[in-house]
């Protein structure tokens, strides 16, 4: 595939070609749906589908009506999430090639310029560097603009097809696959995302969407921090820069280490304050940029009173039940693995329900699982299980 294997040694036997192949990373043009809602168009079904990021119907033009105020509520503060297998690259000097270009608006030269700007957003604040190579050369990342039916999307269970204009904009694959696909039905531009009344179409910011998908290609899932570029609704919010949330995600995935030997000297000279952008990329450890995030998914949890240890054979299906006897008190269940929040199900790894969690025992799923039942800020119950796989 033109890229090196990057799985942890203990996970290499458990993770096959389909392990999370297609990143659960499609980015939808929620701003289009938001505007149509603002104009009073009947988009409730499309809005719900887009939030779930599956089977969103195509959204066409609508008859303008008297604008209504569109309000959005944020119920809780969130943060980054990583893949359950911690999929990552084993090197920082990544290459990419562009296999096809958009047919609407942007020329190949403009497309290359936009992609380079998106890659710079990551290289400016991380140890990664990105270099374009010729299409016939092997590369780590492979970028293309494709129609609805592209590559193996019709036969693959983990790679879905595009849905036409104003739906899913792009999707990416986790390491070490390196694929980044853009919907060629969209109208890509280098400016801000906006609706063109002259053309009657949405013009979508290529740099913004590409930067989001690059984050997935580096191993980050959708962030739950509202101000993060990796947020599912990043297009709607219009964030144009990486947040501290993405940096913490990279630190957690790749380690937080100084990249050059003069970091300690630079830190003593005050560079951590006056050259913060440079020091975040080169010297995060010396400048104490590795500290833990200040925005927990929920309020700080209390330590479980008891952790049950289970030694199970590989391949066994295990189910944990949490707080079934107290759910009638209208408590909400939060699941964690090794103190990381679990927000989604992952086919072949774990199935997340309201009050239960099922996993397939393997090297990837080893760890400590915790559930916390809360009602508002009050902890109603806490349970914890430590899973070890028997060879």
Swiss-Prot record:
Transmembrane parts of this sequence: 19-39
UniProt topological domain (Lumenal) ranges: 40-391
Positions bearing carbohydrate: 93, 149, 233, 317
EC category: hydrolase
UniProt: Zn(2+) binding residues: 212, 216, 222
A GO molecular-function descriptor: metalloendopeptidase activity
Record-level GO BP terms: proteolysis
Protein family membership: Belongs to the peptidase M10A family.
Protein name, entry field: Matrix metalloproteinase-23
Organism: Mus musculus (Mouse)
Gene name tied to this protein: Mmp23
